[in-house]
Amino acid sequence: MSDDSRPSPSGARTAAVIPAAGRGVRLGPGAPKALRALNGTPMLIHAVRAMAASRAVSLVVVVAPPDGTAEVKSLLDAHALPERTDFVVVPGGESRQESVKLGLDALPPGIDIVLVHDAARPLVPVDTVDAVIEAVRDGAPAVVPALPLADTVKQVEPAAVPGEPEPVVATPERARLRAVQTPQGFDRDTLVRAHETVTDNVTDDASMVEQLGARVVVVPGHEEAFKVTRPLDLVLAEAVLARRRLNDGF
C-alpha cells in the first residue's frame, strides 16, 4: 500500500515529526528510550525507517533531547536510510507537547499533511502509515490508528497512596473504546492551530484537536504498532523482528 502514485486532490505533501526527547524511566536507567538498541539498532532508527517506508513521506523531522542533537544527527548518518526522504534533527523541549511544537516549527512551506509518531513505536507497518495519510487526504483533519480493546476497562478513583485499593466508579462500554496508536495524522493548519491554542497538558496531539472542536476519526491500527515502554516490551519487539526476518528478510 506504499505506492504513492495515487494523486491526492490537493497534491498534498507529507512530513513526519518524531519526538524523541524522553528519558524512558520505565525502561530503567541508561540512554534515552529512543536510543535503546532493538536487535542491535536504536529504536529511533527503526521508527524513522518506519515513517520513511511510506513513499508518501518526503521529510522526517526528529526532535532530539535538548542536549543530544549532535548525537542523534550522528546516529542518523551512521545508519542506512532511504535516499528519497529528507531528514532533519532539531532540539526538543521540556515536554512532549513542546517538542512536537518545535518539530512543527521546523517544517518548510509546502507540507500539507503532518504525521506525529512516537519513537517508542518502532515497528508500525507501512500499511498503517499509509492508511492514516490516505484518511487525511480524504478530508479528515485528524486521524488516529487504533485497536479495539481485548480487556474490560474500569474507571477508578485514584488511591491517595500508590498500591492501595482503588474504588471502581464506572465500567465503560468496551465496544465503544479504542486503544490509540501512532502515527497520528493531521491537516497541517489544524495541528498548528491546536498547538497555538491548547495549553492544557494532553497525552496525544489528537486530544488537542478534539479541544478545538475539530473532527477526529479512527482507522484500524496494528498489533505490531505497540509502544515499547517496559523491559518486557523489548522482548516482544525482538520477537517481532525475528519473525519478520524469517518471513521476508526484513
UniProtKB/Swiss-Prot annotation:
It comes from the Bacteria. Its EC number is 2.7.7.60. GO terms for molecular function: 2-C-methyl-D-erythritol 4-phosphate cytidylyltransferase activity. Pathway: Isoprenoid biosynthesis; isopentenyl diphosphate biosynthesis via DXP pathway; isopentenyl diphosphate from 1-deoxy-D-xylulose 5-phosphate: step 2/6. One of its GO terms (biological process) is isopentenyl diphosphate biosynthetic process, methylerythritol 4-phosphate pathway. It is an enzyme of class 2 (transferase). It catalyses: 2-C-methyl-D-erythritol 4-phosphate + CTP + H(+) = 4-CDP-2-C-methyl-D-erythritol + diphosphate. Keywords: Isoprene biosynthesis, Nucleotidyltransferase, Transferase. CDD domains: CDP-ME_synthetase. Catalyzes the formation of 4-diphosphocytidyl-2-C-methyl-D-erythritol from CTP and 2-C-methyl-D-erythritol 4-phosphate (MEP). This is 2-C-methyl-D-erythritol 4-phosphate cytidylyltransferase. It comes from Streptomyces avermitilis (strain ATCC 31267 / DSM 46492 / JCM 5070 / NBRC 14893 / NCIMB 12804 / NRRL 8165 / MA-4680). The gene is ispD.
